Curated annotation (Swiss-Prot):
Xref: PANTHER family: 30S RIBOSOMAL PROTEIN S12 FAMILY MEMBER
Record gene name: rpsL
NCBIfam families for the chain: rpsL_bact
One of the GO biological process terms: translation
Modified sites of kind 3-methylthioaspartic acid: 89
Keyword Ribosomal protein: yes
Protein name per UniProt: Small ribosomal subunit protein uS12
Family: Belongs to the universal ribosomal protein uS12 family.
């Protein structure tokens, strides 16, 4: 416990909240260029080949972002838009690539949750 004199000299430091997505720099989305597109394996007990991309952002950061949905058209030098949101079973992946914007195509033949995957209304 500090004395009253110590508290007068230096007041208590309020703890600052640490951001979960520092590369966005308080923006909802950021644009970037893919430097590498590859697959990664998740932590135990899950097993899969998750599609991820290494992205160099306009904010100067280089981050790993997850590519959601079935199938994608991304390759090196593709321009993408990323948002926050981690993937629980992939360590170090704290961002998602937004489908249906810039060079990223939406998911084909998607009927449910279309807005999350950049899919247009299906033709009847």
């Amino acid at each position: 416990m500090p004395t009253i004199q110590q508290l007068i000299r230096t007041e208590r430091q309020s703890s600052k909240a640490k951001t979960k997505s520092p590369a966005l720099k308080s923006c909802p989305e950021r644009r970037g260029v893919c430097t590498r597109v590859y697959t990664s394996t998740p932590k135990k007990p899950n097993s899969a080949l998750r599609k991820v991309a290494r992205v160099r952002l306009t904010s100067g950061f280089e981050v790993t972002a997850y590519i959601g949905g079935i199938g994608h058209n991304l390759q090196e030098h593709s321009v993408v838009l990323i948002r926050g949101g981690r993937v629980k079973d992939l360590p170090g992946v704290r961002y998602h690539i937004i489908r249906g914007t810039l060079d990223t195509a939406g998911v084909k033949d998607r009927r449910q949750s279309r807005s999350k995957y950049g899919a247009k209304t299906p033709k009847e």
